[in-house]
Regions:
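Typically the conserved alpha-helix immediately C-terminal to a functionally engaged Cys/Sec
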Residues: 50-62
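Positively charged n-region of N-terminal signal peptides that target proteins for export
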Residues: 1-4
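Structural micro-motif
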Residues: 83-92
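Short active-site neighborhood of thiol/selenol oxidoreductases, capturing the structured segment around
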Residues: 32-44
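Hydrophobic h-region of N-terminal signal peptides that target proteins for export
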Residues: 9-17
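Thiol-based oxidoreductase modules, predominantly thioredoxin-like and allied folds used
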Residues: 41, 64-78
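N-terminal leader/targeting and pre-domain segments
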Residues: 17-34, 119-125
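Non-catalytic, surface beta->alpha helical segment in thiol-disulfide oxidoreductase systems
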Residues: 93-125
Length: 125
């Protein structure tokens, strides 16, 4: 019985986790902001966050030197509060001085996301 319960818990956890591939998950306070980068902020059980995961994974695979992080607001609620994040998903764009230069709230398609990454100097082609 114990094995069945543990197995079911693992299955449920897998269903509600996003696959961002090799995009590291970090708390905002742990991210070294010394170069242009993007932080995708989402949370568990967020349909729009989940639908963006494959696109961000593809971008990271196509442009491996592009710095992208994922922050789960469920795991870093202080990071979300301290950065005035009230709606999800949100993409935060930082310059090399560590200053937030832009944010996009809501779902964004791959083509538009690539344009944001280019505009704010995050995309490394």
């Amino acid at each position: 019985m114990k094995k069945i319960v543990i197995s079911l818990m693992l299955i449920v956890a897998t269903l509600f986790s996003h696959d961002f591939g090799n995009v590291p998950e970090k708390k905002l306070s742990q991210i070294k902001k010394d170069r242009p980068l993007m932080v995708m902020v989402g949370k568990t059980k967020c349909i729009w966050c989940d639908s963006m995961a494959p696109q961000i994974k593809e971008i990271k695979e196509q442009y491996p030197k592009t710095v992208i992080y994922y922050m789960n607001a469920d795991k870093d609620p202080l990071g979300a509060i301290n950065n005035n994040i009230v709606e999800l998903p949100v993409q935060l764009f930082y310059n090399k001085e560590g200053k937030e230069v832009a944010r996009h709230v809501g779902y964004i398609g791959k083509k538009d996301l690539l344009e944001y990454l280019r505009t704010y100097g995050v995309l490394v082609e």
